[in-house]
Amino acid sequence: MRTPLKIVLVGLPGSGKTTFGKALAKQLNFAFIDLDQVIEQETGNTISQIFEQEGEGRFRELESIYLKKVLEGIEGFILSTGGGTPCFNDNMELINEKGVSVYLDVSLEEIIRRLGKDAFGKRPMFTNLGDGEAILKLKNLLAARENYYMQAKIKLSGDDISTEQLLSELMVFFRN
């Protein structure tokens, strides 16, 4: 079995990209890379600081720069992207050109359950929003982003499924 060398996870915030990515990286003995962490390390600012001080437009620009840098660098990794990464600056096209994209498709209800009330406020896109506003924003994000996510080479349903089951499903794709 030849496993693709660059696996890129896409999906909404709370879809499990980081959790699943770390488990997959461990199973495949690959590096795990979180794009947000790369941006923070390279810029010396948190994602929240970039949003607050420079705006979302600048963040998306940085996101594209570092996505390209990661995808053109090492091989043998699992990359967890930000929820909006595929939707800007031809990023999804680049992801599909340089790696194997995997969309973790999780229902809004499950994402809301996973994130809980407190986690929304820790994410820049949801800062200063009440629960109802955060849920509405999440629904709007899915509507705006789903077309990009659906361009992924592999789609996995992440509702009511364990990380181990997701890993098994993904390995079936690689064997075929």
Question: Positions of the model-derived regions?
Answer:
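NTP-dependent small-molecule kinase module
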Residues: R2-T3, Q27, A143-N176
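Hydrophobic anchor at the beta1->P-loop junction of P-loop NTPases
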Residues: L9
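P-loop (Walker A) phosphate-binding loop of NTP-binding proteins
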Residues: L12
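ATP-binding Walker
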Residues: S15
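Walker A/P-loop
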Residues: T18
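ATP-dependent small-molecule kinase phosphotransfer cores
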Residues: L35-N96, K117
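A glycine- and Lys/Arg-enriched "phosphate-lid" helix/loop adjacent to the NTP-binding pocket
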Residues: K98-A144
